[in-house]
């Protein structure tokens, strides 16, 4: 499997957000990520799931790479800059994801904790 370039992540975020907002369907977002960004069709689904999870807390997803984790978290917090409740919920969902994977003994998620600590100080 090829490494997904960091340059593709802003568009992954954009399509995931558009699907969440109902501007396009989840399947359209997945196809755009797959076709336009040349990301594996199966993996393309994870970006929407991660975005949705950070906002709603529904269905925790796979852990994406650190750049993606940080980018999505930062952009969601920017989008909700005037909504402290949503920012707190998003950070809580992120923390629960860390705890979920550590609890499943997937291994230490120190890098995720560093990302969490960076943003929790801002809320």
Which sequence ranges carry the predicted segments?
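General secondary-structure propensity
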Residues: 26-36, 51
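DNA major-groove recognition helix of helix-turn-helix
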Residues: 48, 52-55
């Amino acid at each position: 499997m090829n490494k997904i370039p960091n340059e593709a992540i802003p568009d992954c975020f954009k399509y995931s957000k558009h699907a969440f907002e109902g501007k396009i369907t989840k399947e359209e977002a997945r196809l755009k990520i797959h076709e336009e960004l040349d990301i594996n069709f199966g993996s393309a689904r994870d970006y929407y799931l991660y975005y949705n999870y950070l906002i709603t807390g529904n269905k925790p997803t796979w852990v994406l790479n650190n750049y993606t984790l940080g980018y999505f978290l930062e952009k969601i917090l920017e989008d909700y800059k005037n909504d402290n409740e949503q920012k707190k919920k998003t950070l809580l969902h992120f923390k629960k994801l860390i705890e979920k994977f550590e609890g499943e003994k997937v291994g230490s998620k120190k890098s995720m904790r560093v990302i969490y600590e960076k943003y929790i100080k801002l809320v």
